[in-house]
Amino acid sequence: MNSLLSRANSLFAFTLSVMAALTLGCILTTAFKDRSAPVRLHVSRILLKKVEDFTGPRKKSDLGFITFHISADLEKTFDWNVKQLFLYLSAEYSTKSNAVNQVVLWDKILLRGENPKLNLKDVKSKYFFFDDGHGLKGNRNVTLTLSWQVIPIAGILPLVTGSGRVSVPFPDSYEIATTF
C-alpha cells in the first residue's frame, strides 16, 4: 500500500509532465510563425547641435534630434501566445572611426489588447542621439529601422525587423535652436 505522500508525489509528477508537454505543444504551434510586418517610416525634421561632451576627452560632440512618423500594422504579429511586443527605432550609420554605429532613438511596449495598428505622427526621439565625435555632421547615410522583440507566454524570444527602412542625410551645419 502506498502512503499519502507517495500518492501526492506521483500526482504532482504526472501533473508536471502533462504541463511540460502542453507547454512544448504551445511553443511548437507558434515557434515558426512569420512575425514580420510592413513598416512605413518618414522623417519630418532633423536638428543637429554641437554640445559639450562630459563623458570623454573630446571637447564637443554631435547631438542629433529627429522627428518622425511611424505607420505599421502589427495585428498579425499577435496571437494567443504573445504577451507583448517591445518596439524600438534604431539608427545605424558609419563614421571614419567606427564601421558600425547603432543607437536606439525611441521605444514602446505594446501589450496584448492594445491597438496593434501604429499611426504615430510627429514623434520626437525619446533618447539622446549622441555621436562620440563629429560623425553625424554631413553624414549622408543614417538608416532608421523599426524592430521588435516578441515576448511570448511560453517559448523563444524572436527578434524581428520591420520591412520598411529609411535612410536620411544629416545636415552639413549645426543649428542653434532653443527648442526642438
Swiss-Prot record:
This is Adipocyte-related X-chromosome expressed sequence 1. Strongly expressed in epididymal white and brown adipose tissue with low levels in heart. Coiled coil: none annotated. Residues 1-11 are cytoplasmic. GO terms for cellular component: endoplasmic reticulum; signal peptidase complex. Arxes1 and Arxes2 appear to have arisen by retrotransposition of the signal peptidase Spcs3 followed by a segmental duplication event. It comes from the Eukaryota. InterPro entries: SPC3. It holds the Pfam family SPC22. It is found in: Endoplasmic reticulum membrane. Glycans are attached at residue 141. Induction: By the PPARG agonist rosiglitazone. Plays a role in adipogenesis. The chain crosses the membrane at residues 12-32. The keyword DNA repair does not apply. Belongs to the SPCS3 family. Residues 33-180 are lumenal. It comes from Mus musculus (Mouse). It is a single-pass type II membrane protein. Keywords: Endoplasmic reticulum, Glycoprotein, Membrane, Signal-anchor, Transmembrane, Transmembrane helix. GO terms for biological process: fat cell differentiation; signal peptide processing.
